[in-house]
Amino acid sequence: MNLGKIVQVIGNVVDVEFGEGKLPPLLTALFVSNPGLNDQEDNLVLEVAQHLGDNVVRTIGMDLTDGLVRGMPVKDTGNPIMMPVGAAVLGRVINVVGRTVDGLGPVNTDTYMPIHRTAPAFTEQDTSVKVLETGVKVIDLLVPFPRGGKMGMFGGAGVGKTVVMMEMIHNIAMQHGGISVFAGVGERTREGNDLYHEMKDSGVLPRAGLVYGQMTEPPGARARVALSALTVAEYFRDVEGQDVLLFVDNIFRFTQAGAEVSALLGRMPSAVGYQPTLGTDLGELQERITSTTKGSITSVQCVYVPADDLTDPAPATTFAHLDGTVVLSRQIAELGIYPAVDPLDSTSRILDPNVLGEDHYYTAREVQQILQKYKDLQDIIAILGMDELSDEDKLTVARARKIQRFLSQPFHVAETFTGVAGKYVKVEDTVRGFKEICEGKHDDIPEQAFFMAGGIEEVLEKAKQMSAA
């Protein structure tokens, strides 16, 4: 075994000296026993980041380095960080180096994969565009997800990003038998804990793997945890031929951790203090998230926008990789309409008649036109009231309010809070329902019947009950 010894510790950066001609390559994982963490052997993983000369390598710690002293022996593993993969990972919470943090013992598997891999070659990639049905009406109608695509989810605190995410994990697991991988990158520990328990209670956990690198972790772990989670997803795609959903919350923290690591390694910062390799770092991660001829990874990434500045280098670089954006709006949440997706701000690359078909495309555009008209009329309504509108505008407003309410939907994962059974709505039923509203077939039905309903049949049933009462 190739052994080295620690020669310098500066915070999270550890320099290790090896024998002549024995230097481990860049990105190799090294093991060291740190008594400051616990009394287990090889409990700290270091990743080689630079070769300094004089047989010394500079490494970044994947955990706290308090307790390390000069002269400690370091083992060269000969590999990058190796992640446990396969069915044994499902239902478990693991950290950046593949060790469990849920207190249920180690992952029981013999299959491991390195976290640093090249993106699939052009010849292996699947270029056909297919739609991934989520069962969430507003997303399937207005922001269709491309299979193997990347969607960004933008929203402030408390508008329901996590609930929408969990519903998608539930629907993919229940309807498609699909697998989900969740990467908590720079997450609040409390949120990660809540998500684990909510998924456990709603029965989704056995079809999902959770990989966490929380805010308390050093930057090395936060800069690598997204790659660790992606490796778990890649195994299901490449070896088992599955369609996998990869959730990353939050992709900004990945960039932020990269900037911290870059500063620790003494690299010259670029604009706004970010790392000079910002585009490369993000590109290496995003290019691995794709469809191949074997299976697909569809990714939903929460994007934090610093100071609401979309021109900040971190979100601006992320935008270049996304196929669409789901914008969650506080104004819509205030109306009590959940999921609080903004139908006019959200966009998808595949909202196109050649992909979705004429019927779906024109229904989606008609819905957006009616909602936009209603938005334009709201100032007049606020000042003069509904009575001053023309008959045509009154009809538009009535339909828009019905559409707005029909875009709400009871979720399976929220059943415990709402007491209303969750609904999965197929794309064709969604399109048919909205088309009928736009055509005026349901102008006589009260708008309250459309609120928190599944398909249009349920609306008609509700309306019957309301008229009978």
UniProtKB/Swiss-Prot annotation:
Per UniProt, subcellular location reads as: Cell inner membrane
- Repressor among keywords: no
What topology in the membrane does the UniProt record assign? Answer: Peripheral membrane protein
List of residues binding ATP: 155-162
> Coiled-coil intervals in this record?
none
- Cellular component GO terms held in the UniProt record: plasma membrane; proton-transporting ATP synthase complex
Q: What sort of enzyme, by top EC class, is this? A: translocase
- Report the GO molecular function annotations: ATP binding; ATP hydrolysis activity; proton-transporting ATP synthase activity, rotational mechanism
Q: Known catalysed reaction(s)?
A: ATP + H2O + 4 H(+)(in) = ADP + phosphate + 5 H(+)(out)
Output the Pfam families linked to this UniProt entry. ATP-synt_ab (PF00006), ATP-synt_ab_N (PF02874), ATP-synt_VA_C (PF22919)
Keyword Iron tagged: no
**Keywords per UniProt:** ATP synthesis, ATP-binding, Cell inner membrane, Cell membrane, CF(1), Hydrogen ion transport, Ion transport, Membrane, Nucleotide-binding, Translocase, Transport
Q: Please give the InterPro entries that the UniProt record associates with this protein.
A: AAA+_ATPase, ATP-synt_VA_C, ATP_synth_F1_bsu, ATPase_a/bsu_AS, ATPase_alpha/beta_chains, ATPase_F1/V1/A1_a/bsu_N, ATPase_F1/V1/A1_a/bsu_N_sf, ATPase_F1/V1/A1_a/bsu_nucl-bd
Q: What is its EC number?
A: 7.1.2.2
Similarity annotation: Belongs to the ATPase alpha/beta chains family.
> What does this chain do?
Produces ATP from ADP in the presence of a proton gradient across the membrane. The catalytic sites are hosted primarily by the beta subunits.
Q: Which NCBIfam families match?
A: atpD (TIGR01039)
Q: How does it assemble?
A: F-type ATPases have 2 components, CF(1) - the catalytic core - and CF(0) - the membrane proton channel. CF(1) has five subunits: alpha(3), beta(3), gamma(1), delta(1), epsilon(1). CF(0) has three main subunits: a(1), b(2) and c(9-12). The alpha and beta chains form an alternating ring which encloses part of the gamma chain. CF(1) is attached to CF(0) by a central stalk formed by the gamma and epsilon chains, while a peripheral stalk is formed by the delta and b chains.
Q: What is this protein called?
A: ATP synthase subunit beta
